[in-house]
Amino acid sequence: MATVSMRDMLKAGVHFGHQTRYWNPKMKPFIFGARNKVHIINLEKTVPMFNEALAELNKIASRKGKILFVGTKRAASEAVKDAANSCDQFFVNHRWLGGMLTNWKTVRQSIKRLKDLETQSQDGTFEKLTKKEALMRTRELEKLENSLGGIKDMGGLPDALFVIDADHEHIAIKEANNLGIPVFAIVDTNSDPDGVDFVIPGNDDAIRAVSLYLGAVAATVREGRSQDLASQAEESFVEAE
């Protein structure tokens, strides 16, 4: 199963927190000290906590669980999308729309509209419209694709959230808490760990650190899914005998 070592984390700068004046005292148990007015995260805590989170995500994936990757900061946006796509999971990487989980009924209607517009754009419907109407629908399609494209095939609520930056994505975390969906999150020294079921203390800004987290999670999810597929194949083989 995918695991991450202390050396990997040091190389990626996972241990660099935020400036000491921005700290959240609830993160004190995970802070090693400070250097040049920047908090240093204790990787002796982070390594086992991250590997425990990976083991749990692997389990969820092996039971056909759906994992929603959330990272709407510009620096993480593309990496979040790529990681989710690489393990056939789902993502929100632009703006978290309030009610995305707690008001799923309405979101489902918007997803239906997105899929209808996609069909229209491909079956020649747009070409039969006036230029103005076609432009309006194209813009609507782009807007919906931007906000819902990563969850349009999710088919219901996710079984877990993997979040880059607990502070930035606090609305998503709150919604997941309300619905009892487990939250796995990168929590930096300026963030509140409350509401996060699997806290991963670490740098949530450096792209190398973000890529390290996402790469490990995607790998463990792929592994979990392949276990699920292997057990399905075994079952059908037994039935055929």
From Swiss-Prot:
Record-linked PROSITE patterns: RIBOSOMAL_S2_1, RIBOSOMAL_S2_2
Keyword terms: Ribonucleoprotein, Ribosomal protein
Protein's UniProt keywords contain Disulfide bond: no
Domain of life of the native organism: Bacteria
SUPFAM superfamilies per the UniProt record, alphabetical: Ribosomal protein S2
This protein's GO CC annotations: cytosolic small ribosomal subunit
Homology family: Belongs to the universal ribosomal protein uS2 family.
Designated name of the protein: Small ribosomal subunit protein uS2
